[in-house]
A protein has these predicted regions:
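Basic, glycine/lysine-rich polyanion-binding surfaces/domains
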Residues: 1-162
Length: 162
């Protein structure tokens, strides 16, 4: 079969788990702005940060006050150096009182782990990449809520809810 012929059709071609094409960019943009698009963010780095000191530890490293995020909620934040320079943008998602998931695009899990780990000294914090444990999908667009309802799924109550 001609691989290039498949590229003319909407939808992803997958080879070894990596999307090669989502179709035409104009169709992707139309789905995101006029209807619903399922965005695969599985290549984003995901890191589990847990332990009794996790909220205080992350609060020192991120621009967001993660101590006040309720479980099941999240917030965008920047990871900072000790001098306040931005290292990368990420989302901090609170799983429970002592566990967070950090999600960052444009970087792999090993890099995210190394950036966080360099500031870990005596804190009771455990770090573990989440790459192989789960997929990360995002339903986006103006009709995303209706699509969720049609599928019988609840709409998240707030931005970054999970």
């Amino acid at each position: 079969l001609d691989r290039l012929a498949y590229l003319e059709h909407a939808g992803a071609l997958i080879s070894a788990g990596v999307v090669q094409s989502y179709g035409h960019a104009a169709d992707e943009y139309a789905a995101l702005t006029r209807s619903t698009a399922l965005v695969d963010a599985s290549t984003d780095a995901r890191l589990d940060v847990g332990g009794t000191d996790a909220p205080v530890f992350l609060n020192r490293l991120l621009t967001a006050n993660v101590r006040h995020i309720a479980p099941g909620q999240g917030t965008p934040a920047f990871l900072l150096t000790s001098t306040g320079r931005i290292v990368l943008a990420l989302y901090a998602l609170r799983e429970n009182e002592a566990r967070f998931s950090l999600v960052a695009g444009g970087v792999d899990a090993a890099t995210l782990l190394a950036e966080i780990d360099r500031y870990l000294v005596t804190e009771r914090v455990e770090l573990a990449p989440l790459e192989s444990l789960q997929a990360l999908l995002s339903l986006q667009g103006p009709t995303a809520a209706a699509t969720l309802a049609t599928a019988g799924l609840p709409r998240p109550g707030a931005p970054y809810a999970h």
